Regions:
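Membrane-cytosol interface segments
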Residues: 1-92, 336
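Histidine- and acidic-residue-rich, metal-dependent catalytic cores
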Residues: 63-64, 68-344
C-alpha cells in the first residue's frame, strides 16, 4: 500500500502473523524528503493502529470463542498426557483432533489463524501452547503439500505430541531465562527419547507420531540429535514437524529477545535450512510464507519504509521493494547490512 493509504485489516493481519506488536526501527533516521513523511513516524502510525486492532480482536466475540477453545485444547492435552505418563492410560487421539478441528473451524487461512494466536501469548503452559501451535502450523504445511485428510490428522497429532517428553524435564530448566549450562542442555536433549518411550506404550498410535517425537530435532545433514540421523533415515512427518517447531520458536517472544520479523526467519532458514531440512518441505513453507507479504508495507534496517513489489524466488528473504518516490531496489543485490526489519 502506498504512503498515506488507510490501514486495512489485511495489512494489520500480516503484522499479527508473526506476532509483531510494534515496528522497532534501528539505525539513524534518514533525512526526510520534501513532501514525504518520515519513515519512523510512519512506522509509529502503523504500530499505533495495529495496537488498536489487537485490542479490537481481543475484545471480539470470535476471539473469545477461540480463546475458550484454545484453553480447552490445552486442558485436554494436560489431562490426557498426565494420565498417559502417570497411569499409562491410552491417549484419546480423536478427542485431541476434535479440539484442533474446533480451532480451525471458520479459520481457513494462516492469517486468520495467527490473528487469533497472536492474542494468546499470555498462556502460561508453554510446552502445551507450543505443541498446539506446532500442530496448527504442521497442519497448514500439510495443506500446502495437498495431503489427504487422514495424513493431515496424523501430522496434526504428531505436532501435538512431539514435545511430550519435555513434561519429564524439570520446569526450572525448561523455563530458565537466558542461556543453559552444558549439563542443563544435555538434559533438554533427552526429551525426544523420553517422548518416544511414552508414546511407545500407546499401541494404537500411528508410528509416524512416535517417530516425530523421537526425530523432530534430527537434521538432514546429520547435525541434529539425539542420534545424528541423516535425511534418508528421518521420518517425513518428523521433518515437517521440525520446520513448524523451529518456526514457532523463532517467532515467539523470549526473555532475551523480541519475536523475529518473518523475513529474518526466512533468512535464517535460507542460511542453512536447505542442508538441515528436507528441500521440498522447506521450499513450500518459505514460498508460502513469503507470498503472504506480496504488496505489503515493510521497514528496512536503515529505517526507510517501502513496499514489496516482487519476490526473488532464489532469495525469498530479499525481495524487490519500491519506495514512496517510485524508485525500486532489489534487496538481493544490496548490501547484507540492508534487510527487512519489520513487516507492517
Amino acid at each position: 500500500a502506498p504512503a498515506g493509504s488507510a490501514v486495512t485489516r489485511q495489512l494489520i493481519n500480516r503484522m499479527k502473523l508473526y506476532r509483531v506488536e510494534y515496528a522497532e526501527i534501528e539505525g539513524e533516521e534518514p533525512a526526510p524528503q520534501e513532501e514525504a513523511p518520515k519513515p519512523v513516524k510512519e512506522a509509529k502510525t502503523y504500530a499505533q493502529e495495529s495496537k488498536t486492532h489487537s485490542q479490537k480482536v481481543a475484545g471480539s466475540s470470535e476471539f473469545r470463542t477461540f480463546q475458550i477453545e484454545y484453553v480447552q485444547a490445552i486442558e485436554l492435552m494436560k489431562q490426557l498426557y498426565t494420565a498417559a505418563i502417570k497411569d499409562n492410560k491410552p491417549i484419546d487421539s480423536q478427542k485431541l483432533l476434535g479440539s484442533v478441528a474446533d480451532l480451525f473451524q471458520s479459520r481457513n487461512t494462516i492469517v486468520e489463524m495467527f490473528d487469533m494466536l497472536y492474542n494468546m501469548r499470555t498462556v502460561a503452559d508453554s510446552v502445551y501452547a507450543h505443541s498446539l501451535n506446532v500442530a496448527l502450523i504442521s497442519r497448514m504445511i500439510g495443506r500446502w503439500l495437498r495431503f489427504e485428510r487422514h495424513d493431515l490428522d496424523i501430522l496434526t497429532l504428531a505436532g501435538l505430541m512431539h514435545d511430550i517428553g519435555k513434561l519429564l524435564i524439570p520446569s526450572d530448566i525448561l523455563n530458565k531465562p537466558g542461556s543453559l549450562t552444558d549439563e542443563e542442555f544435555a538434559k533438554i536433549k533427552q526429551h525426544p527419547a523420553l517422548g518416544y518411550e511414552i508414546l511407545k506404550r500407546q499401541p494404537d498410535l500411528d508410528s509416524r507420531i512416535k517417530k516425530a517425537a523421537l526425530m523432530h530435532h534430527e537434521r538432514c545433514d546429520g547435525s541434529g540429535y539425539p542420534t545424528g540421523l541423516t535425511e534418508d533415515y528421518i521420518d517425513n512427518f518428523a521433518m515437517i514437524v521440525a520446520i513448524a517447531d523451529v518456526y514457532d520458536a523463532m517467532t515467539a517472544a523470549r526473555s532475551y529477545r523480541s519475536p523475529l520479523c518473518p523475513f529474518e526467519v526466512i533468512s535464517k532458514f535460507e542460511e542453512d535450512g536447505f542442508q538441515k531440512y528436507h528441500t521440498k518441505y522447506i521450499l513450500v513453507f518459505l514460498k508460502q510464507i513469503a507470498s503472504t507479504y506480496q504488496s505489503n508495507r515493510v521497514i528496512l534496517s536503515d529505517g526507510r519504509g517501502c513496499t514489496i513489489v516482487m519476490l526473488n524466488q532464489n532469495a525469498l528473504s530479499r525481495p524487490i521493494v519500491q519506495f514512496d518516490d517510485k524508485s525500486c531496489l532489489d534487496l538481493s543485490t544490496a548490501s547484507r547490512d540492508l534487510y527487512i526489519k519489520a513487516v507492517l
